Structures are given as structure tokens and as C-alpha cells.
Curated annotation (Swiss-Prot):
EC number: 4.2.1.17, 5.1.2.3, 1.1.1.35
NCBIfam families: FadJ, PRK11154.1
Protein name, entry field: Fatty acid oxidation complex subunit alpha
Localization per Swiss-Prot or TrEMBL: Cytoplasm
Keyword Isomerase annotated: yes
Chain segments carrying region Enoyl-CoA hydratase: 1-190
Annotated site residue numbers, Important for catalytic activity: E118, E140
Function text: Catalyzes the formation of a hydroxyacyl-CoA by addition of water on enoyl-CoA. Also exhibits 3-hydroxyacyl-CoA epimerase and 3-hydroxyacyl-CoA dehydrogenase activities.
Gene that this sequence comes from: fadJ
Organism from which the protein derives: Salmonella typhi
Any one biological process term the GO annotation gives: fatty acid beta-oxidation
HAMAP family tied to this protein: FadJ
A GO CC term attached to the entry: cytoplasm
Amino acid sequence: MTTTSAFMLSVRLDNVAVVAIDVPGEKVNTLKAEFAAQVRAILKQIRENKALQGVVFISAKADNFIAGADINMIGHCQNAQEAETLARQGQQLMAEIQALPVPVIAAIHGACLGGGLEMALACHRRICTDDVKTVLGLPEVQLGLLPGSGGTQRLPRLVGVSTALDMILTGKQLRARQALKAGLVDDVVPQTILLEAAVELAKKERLAQRTLPVRERILAGPLGRALLFRLVRKKTAQKTQGNYPATERIIDVIETGLAQGSSSGYDAEARAFGELAMTPQSQALRAVFFASTEVKKDPGSDAPPGPLNSVGILGGGLMGGGIAWVTACKGGLPVRIKDINTQGINHALKYSWDLLETKVRRRHIKASERDKQLALISGSTDYRGFSHRDLVIEAVFEDLPLKQQMVAEVEQNCATHTIFASNTSSLPIGDIAANAARPEQVIGLHFFSPVEKMPLVEVIPHASTSAQTIATTVKLAKKQGKTPIVVSDKAGFYVNRILAPYINEAIRMLTEGERVEHIDAALVKFGFPVGPIQLLDEVGIDTGTKIIPVLEAAYGERFSAPANVVASILNDDRKGRKNGRGFYLYGEKGRKSKKQVDPAIYKLIGVQGQSRLSAQQVAERCVMLMLNEAARCFDEKVIRSARDGDIGAVFGIGFPPFLGGPFRYMDALGPGEMVATLQRLAALYGPRYAPCEQLVRMAERREHFWTNGETDQGN
């Protein structure tokens, strides 16, 4: 065997070469620039061995093929030319793999993403396992980039242009059966026979060429291609609002390769990669990626976590059902649900059944896996089965005496080490723990709805919470697949506190006569996934506004909502999507009607509904209040760092990722510009816009939230 660090070459007795990929000291394989020489040395040996019948590339890691290229390489590039050179080096290496004179097979188990899939595309055939960990995709667009090692050229020719555009523009990941159906892989086999199946495929003297589906062949022609690209450009522009330049360049590069040939396509790909790497959008998106990676590694405290073998949940409603699902099906932990009646328990069980059954129908998992995961969830109307639970999460009504009662019951019926975690969105954790016998084991664990989709959780220790309780709760959140940030026990915590003034200002502009659709469109244009009015409808107007009085009582008039407006809307039985009528009209199944905005809303609040502000003015009024409040949270140490503040806003409320989060955005604007803008708005609209002391100090000292050592690279 010849060993060259991350790549190991061995030749079997049947004259098939096996290249095992195993990056030393890393949990996952990532491609680095220094590996090029190692791979070329192996390719040279393969070319010189005339007896070889084929080659198999396979990972020696337990559950991943290649997770992508090392993103730090991009951060080391000083200009577009250096990044372009990096792409061309990758293209050349993939071309050398493709040019090998014998069949080359990629044997894929686990994640095959980014540069990993580009390497697999350079192989002549691909075979993968049917494991749930096996996913294939090109997610570079999520970093403001495009695939730079030939992916934009090879993928359309393999699976067809429409499928390739969909994959590259969205960064979506295909599971094994989806990849087989798309033609991305040639076979799907159990992991136990992956290597042997790949070897047998490599031994075949002639590998049959795959024929594209009729639809893809039509779209590959000049007329079909012209129509497709016109539609894709229009749809993409509507979705990105011009905020993500990578999507436009992806379309251009793929079209160039199909219209002018792969050589021109590779040139266009490398140039676009270099230019995109230097854009502020890519730098911000990479910063979010590195920050989220760091947060996921953060243990929350210096203490070791306590035992975490099973979990209890109080309440089988929407939140309780979602928490049960992520705990059992994502975390693999046994869950016991307690509700006051069997209907609540059945609701929670059905919640998990519906989600798992959808996965079965889509062939993401097998029915046996569904049954195995569902078996982890059980329920009762009393505390039977709770005595050994390591952590209990309450998801009951926002009622302080009720939650205090839950603490007492858990302390009576569970083990002395059991942690009590409250899913409250507004009540102080210290108040919930006020009468606790073991207050050091009481903590907040705030999930966002829908639980199965929203990636963020806030972990909220109160003054007496122990370091071990924090560490154990953070560990649970990570097992649930969540990104946890630890925040202080102050009214609204972090996410809801910065969201409230943003939504309040949108409602205030509504009372000034601005139209609902104009307000929402302005914030979508700015970069939010939905506008503030639609967000309130989605969350539930009653639920979303419940925290306003709490915040107003804690922080004063800057959190007051427009007088009587919210009450008028709620008194008219408008709760949003959940009851079919809010600011928007909804059909029976909760879908928006063609009419969308309910015109009666303007009469209800006593305005005509005629917009006078520009989209930029609307966005500025909402966003500047959010930024100012985020700076206050930083000053008051509600969040531990700018990193946590950025991740909380991006993952919790959809703050535009291409801006990097509120703190990177404020740094980009500059504290002086922030203060000047807020002072201008305060003169126009009142003292709620007065810049906070933190921003004023930073402007005077010319400071930033992110220090010079905290770049867009991983540490």
C-alpha cells in the first residue's frame, strides 16, 4: 500500500485500484489545496499501471464521502484573480481524474457535497448507499458562490439542464433514491456491499451511456433552452430580489457552457467563482457559516454536562408535539409526554406520525425506521414513567402560576438531578424558579415555531442556574439538531426583543396609511423571507402581540404598540392564518386567496390605505429599530457576543443572511452612520429612534462589534 496522507492507494488482486480518502485528524473529509499533489501522485501511479482494470474512489470515514472543499481556502485569497486560480486548479485536477484510461467509480456513503460531488462527477460512474446519511448536492450558492471545480458544466450534461439548475440554484441535497431517479448515481446499494458493487462496476469494459429523459432533451435544444433560461431568470429574480449575485452568475455560466461548449463554460465558471468570492454577500454568508459552526461547537459553559438518556415533555400541543419529534426523531432519545387528557397525547403522537409518514412517502426513510423512531415516544396523563427522566421540558400555557406548579410537580415526581426547562417566550425564568426546591436545575429553553423547521433555540439561565444545567441543556439542543445560543434572563430574551419594535413599526406605518402589501414587499426587497405583517399573520396575531405588554412594562414606551389597533384587530376575531383571517384573507386550508390583503383591514383601523413612503423608507424605519435594540442587547449582555447576536437573528427571524446578521451589518454601515441615521429618524418620528448609548460610544471611539481578529474565516 502506498500512503499519501489523505489519499491511500491500494491495488486489489483483481487489478482494481482503490483510492481511500481519509483526511487525518478530521471527523469529515474536506478537500484542501495541498491535497492536489497527493492526488496527482496517485493518478500518475494509476496511469503507469497498465494492468489495472478500473479505479474506485471511496471514503475511509465512517459516515461521509467528502463534505466539500475547505472554505478557509477562499478567505486566504487576496483578490479575485487568486480565487479564480484556485478554481482553475480544482478544474484541472478533476479533468485529470476524468481522463484516466480505465473506468473510474465514485463509491459514496454519507455526505457528498460541494467539491466532493464535483470529484464524483469527474468519475465515470457513481454508486451510493441507501443510508439516510447519504446526501449529494452542490450547496455553494448558500455561501454566495458557485461550484468552481467543473460542477456547473458536468452536472447539466449528466442529469439535464433543468434538474441541474434546480440543484445548483437552491443548493438542495438529494437522498440516494432521489439521486438515482435524477440520474446522478447509477446504483444504490446497502453499505455492506458498497465497495464490492463499485469494483464490479469498474471491471466492466464498456459503461453504457445514460440517455436523458425526453423533457431534458427538449430543454437542451436551442428553443427549449432559451425558454427555460428566460423563465429561470424571472423566477430567480423574484425570489432573490437581486440580493444574491451568485444566482445570476450560476445561470450565466451554465448557459455559456451549453451554448458555447464546455471549454468556454469552464472559463466562465472560474472567472465567476473568483469574482463572487470577493463580493460582500459571499463574505457575509461565509461569516454566517463559520459563526454557526462555532456556535454548534460551543458547550455553553465550562462544566461537563450531566446525564442525558431520556426526556419528559409537559403538554401535547403544537409546541409539545414538535419538541417531542425533534427529541426522539432527531436526537434519538426516548420521550415521555404528559398531558391533562389523552387527546393532547394523541395529538403529539399524530404530529410525529404525520412528519415521519411524509418522509416514508418521499422515500427518505423506510417504514421500519418510521416505526423505530415513533416507538421512542410514549405518553400518559400522570407522571408514570417520569421518575428517571434526566430533563423535562414544559410546553404549557404562558401562565406563571401554572409553570410554577409544573416545577413543583416535576421536583416531586422526578429524580433529584432532573432539569426543568421552560419553553416560555416571555415569562422570566427567575420567576418560574422562584419557589423551586432546586432552582439551580431550572432553565429556559425557548423553541421557535414550527419546531421541526426553525433551527434556533434560546437557552436562558436565570441567576441561580448551575453551569452543569446550562451545559446539559445546550447538549440536548444540539442532539435535537438545533443551533443554541445562551441568552440572559431579561424580558423578551433576545430574538423576540429585537423583533417586537420591527413589527410594531410596521403596524404603526399601517395606521399612517401605508398599504399592507407595500410594507411587506419593502422588507422582502430588503432581504427578509417574509414581510413583518405577513409574519404576524403566520405566527398568529394573538400570539405574536402577547409579548408587547411585557416588553413595554420592562423597557418603557419605545415598545408600545399603536393605540387600540391590535385590540381592534383581535376583537374582530382576526388571528391570522390559523383561523383564516388576519391582515390577509385565507382559504379553507390556510392558503392565501387571490385577493390576498383583506381590504376591510383599512376600514377597521380607520385609514384609506394609500402608500406615501418609498420601499427604502419603509425598510429603514423597521430595520433601524431592530438594529438599535440589538445594540442595546449587546450592551446589556443579553447576548454573549456579536456572533451569537448575528446567529440568533439570522436563524431565529430570518434576518438577511447576505448581510451577515445585524452586528456585521452595523459594522458595515459604521457606528457613525448608524447614529446619524437614528438621529435623523428620531427628529422625524420621535424618541423611540434615539440611538442607544452603546452605538454613541462606539461612534465616538470608532469601534466595531466584531474585532479585527474575527474575520470571515473559521478558527
